[in-house]
Each structure stands twice: as structure tokens, then as C-alpha cells.
Amino acid sequence: EDYKMSNLPEVKIGVVAVSRDCFPESLSVNRRKALMKAYTEKYGTDSVYECPVCIVESEIHMVQALEDIKKAGCNALCVYLGNFGPEISETLLAKHFDGPAMFIAAAEETQNDLLGGRGDAYCGMLNASYNLKLRNVKAYIPENPVGTAAECADMLHEFISIARAIVGLSDLKIISFGPRPLNFLACNAPIKQLYNLGVEIEENSELDLFEAFKKHDGDERIPAKVKEMEAELGAGNHKPEVLPKLAQYELTLLDWIEAHRGYRKYVAIAGKCWPAFQTQFGFVPCYVNSRLTGMGIPVSCEVDIYGW
């Protein structure tokens, strides 16, 4: 199985415009349309969704927008202040949305229309950030969050990577095989902080792994896996005699992942490769670790749970 897709979070950002009722709603809506046009022209239509609901100082609008982006399959949120914005309902949206949220705002396009075209979104961002803190809502605010449609499109695109990391962490299980080697305190994982990030961890002993490896002796899938490795290594296959054991180990880890992922979508492995690994397993696991990483399964060694 190729884990490059299944083990990598797909991000879909719901873009929700907001408006304060003493400003024209059309100002926010038109600026949202300009933002989406700028985004799709530069980055395409993937990863973003334009919510048709503009929140106008209304908790009911907030609920409507929330339901709409959920229905559209969004797992990340961009609150776009087209004008000053309603600090209560816009921050409630971020509070009730189950996923990463970003707040950005529209700069004034011109000095020529200060009656109908003035939005004061910069000031609105100040109020929004203050209200987010009051509610203990964590949201991403770029260093310069107020910009033109093109600048905000770039911010939206940059948010994809941030959102992907947060979405991934919230549905990640780290499978570890330890304990850590002697004198490597840096590899000692503070489990509490992993839980604080929303990460699950399954800690196993090296002996558990060794038992599972032994149970894969004579696995009928080993010859096919060896051929796969031979084709990949080509002229670099200087130790053909060790390939069956490496194939057995790779199958052990892949089977372990599927048997132990539980309810989590994404999996990473923190393994151990010394000092007893080489003498007991009969090989070093670096090649298998790199193959798994190439498949889309991150693997660290030395039980480096928190560092990878």
C-alpha cells in the first residue's frame, strides 16, 4: 500500500467573510470574491472553498456558516474581515470550528471612496485578536495579516502547510519501540506535551518488536518484498544475503501499523537501532526506515519521539 496519500492530511480551507452591520455587507462579499479570484488565478481551486454565507454581526449567521463549511468537508477555516467585522460572532466561529483557523483582513483599495468603500478591517483585526484571547481560542494570525486580495491569497496559500500540520497532529499516532538508548536523554519524550498537541502515542518495548519479527519468519510475502528491494537497489545491492531479513522487518512494521493504528488516520514510527538491535535482529534497520519514509510513513531512530 502506498501511504503517501493516506498518511498525508488533505486540507480544505473554508473561507468565510464577515461584516459589521454599520458597514456595507457588499463590501465584505465583494472583497471575498476578489480574494477567491486572486487565489484561484494563482494557485487553482484545490484546497479552498468559498462559503456563501457572510456573517453580519449575527450568531445565527455564524451557525449557518459553520454548518455550511462542515457540509463542504472543510477541515480548516479562514475568517476574512472584509470590513471591521463582528468580533463576537467571528471569534465564536473559530471557537466552534473543529480545526485550525486563520484570521486575515482586507486593506483599503483606494482613497476615492471613503463612504461606501471604507472597511476599517485593520482596526477590526485588533478587536478580533483581543476577543480570541478573551475566549482562549487559538488561531493563526500572519505577521502582516492585512493585505490586498493578492497578498491575502498568498497568506491563504501559506496557511495550507500550517493547517496540514495541525490537522495531522490532531489525528496522529506515534508508535514507538524503545526504551531510548543509554545517555540519550534528548530522546526522552514528554508524553504530556504530546497529549497537549492532540497526539496519541503507543509505547512498545524492543522485545515486543522482536517477538513480532520472529512471528514473521517464513512469511510468504518475503520473496516478493526481496525482489522489490533488489530492483530498487540495483548495482548497490552489496549485501543480498541480508535482504530477506530486511523484507521480514519491513513487513513486521507495516503489519504492526495496520494492527495498532486504532482510530487514528495518520501514523509515524519512532524506532531503535542500537546497541542490541544489530546483534539480535541481525541487521541495521536504516534501509527499511528510509523505504517506509519514502512510502509516506515518517520514521525516526533512537526513539526520537518528540524531535522528529
Feature-to-residue mapping (PLM):
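Metallocofactor- and cofactor-centric catalytic cores in central/energy metabolism, strongly enriched
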Residues: Y3-V167, D171-I175, R180-A270
